[in-house]
Curated annotation (Swiss-Prot):
Binding locations of ATP: 173-180
GO CC terms of this entry: host cell nucleolus; host cell nucleoplasm; virion component
Domain of life: Viruses
Function (record text): Component of the packaging machinery which encapsidates the viral DNA into preformed capsids and transcriptional activator of the viral major late promoter (MLP). Binds, along with packaging proteins 2 and 3, to the specific packaging sequence on the left end of viral genomic DNA and displays ATPase activity thereby providing the power stroke of the packaging machinery. The activity of packaging protein IVa2 is stimulated by protein 33K which acts as a terminase. May be the protein that pumps DNA into the capsid powered by ATP hydrolysis.
UniProt xrefs under InterPro entries: Adeno_IVa2 (IPR003389), P-loop_NTPase (IPR027417)
Name of the protein this chain belongs to: Packaging protein 1
Predominant location: virion
Organism encoding this protein: Human adenovirus A serotype 12 (HAdV-12)
Gene: IVa2
Subunit structure: Homodimer. Part of a genome packaging complex composed of packaging proteins 1, 2 and 3; this complex specifically binds to the packaging sequence on the left end of viral genomic DNA and performs packaging of the viral genome. Interacts with protein 33K.
Amino acid sequence: MLPCRSTGRRHALQHQPPQFKAHTGQRSTRSASIHRDRNNPDAHITSLEGQNPRPFGCSPPRSLQQQPAKPPQRGSLLDRDGIENITELWDRLQLLKQTLDHMPMADGLKPLKNFKSLQELLSLGGERLLGELAKQNIRVRQMMNEVAPLLHEDGSCTSLNYHLQPVIGVIYGPTGCGKSQLLRNLLSAQLVTPAPETVFFIVPQVDMIPPSEIKSWEMQICEGNYVPGPEGTIIPQSGTLCPKFVKLSYDDLTLDHNYDVSDPENIFAQAAARGPIAIIMDECMENLGSHKGVSKFFHAFPSKLHDKFPKCTGYTVFVVLHNMNPRRDLAGNIANLKIQSKLHIMSPRMHPTQLNRFINTYTKGLPLAISLLLKDIFNHHAQRCCYDWIIYNTNPEHEALQWSYLHPKDGLMPMYLNIQAHLYKILEHIHRVLNDRERWSRAYHVRKNKYQ
């Protein structure tokens, strides 16, 4: 008897997805599941828009396309701020151009082309040039704002060295130009910071100092030691109520024990142990040109005193010279002094050839027109009966303070030669733009006449 065969219906396998028959004209592809595998949720993540993948390059139906990024639109250059900047810059450029045109030394300068008026500039300048001028005026404002924290409200400088140490300065001036008064004013007006507690006044012979000058020194250095305080009080600027004034001959200065900081008899070391000191050499040009070297006081002394005596927070040396280029300098004191000096204080009454030589040496980074402008400033003040001075700072706190003007009433005023040089370069740029336009116009007319 044959065994019995089960004739019942086959049961479908559980968890088996239904099979769909592929179209005969379409290649079968594996369709992605709309469900995620819980063991690997990030595998085959697709959009839920449909089972079949869309052809390459076709955007999905009803999908939002991202718009391409557009460059930011530039605002109008002739708005109120733009016109204000251009107008302000135009006034500055016109003032500089008129000054340069009326200089006696302007014969050697090339004439610069410019627009006849502000209205002509605004109408014919063009978008590119006007935009550049507006940006340049913003830059000029930034240059002026950078130096504002270093000035008083009236625009004068708050200090000559701005706590930069040591202070080594040379004063050039002929007889009778007010060099001694200038030295006292620098200390009494608190232009040298910190204020010295001991001032050494060195001359060839102590007997040559008149009593009235000694009294003036004592009064003015005491005046420079105080500033006005609240409610009518005065505040001392140093550790002493009355700075000490010490008269010293040049021979006493060059004694052997004064060269050694560790020597207990060194008078400069004794004073440095109490506070800042200042050394003033007046009428000592002949002594400086001798064989005895004193260059140690210009470069070796400051660092040694600062290291040995912490209270000596200031070291100031001012040397008076009647000639900017003395022939007699046997020990090299004057040459070394001019190298180490950070401040060159010049009287406009010095010989013009010496001043021009100094200006040509120290203004090589400035345009020729600005150098000639500086020479014209010296010539202008040389004709005035005023005890004013022009100062060159080799290491200024700001570039605008490299050249400054010291007036008895106005104080120490910066000359802003860096801004004047920047404005002159703008004038040169306008000149080049107008030259290019004229050249293009000539070339256009030549070609036009050629084909007619």
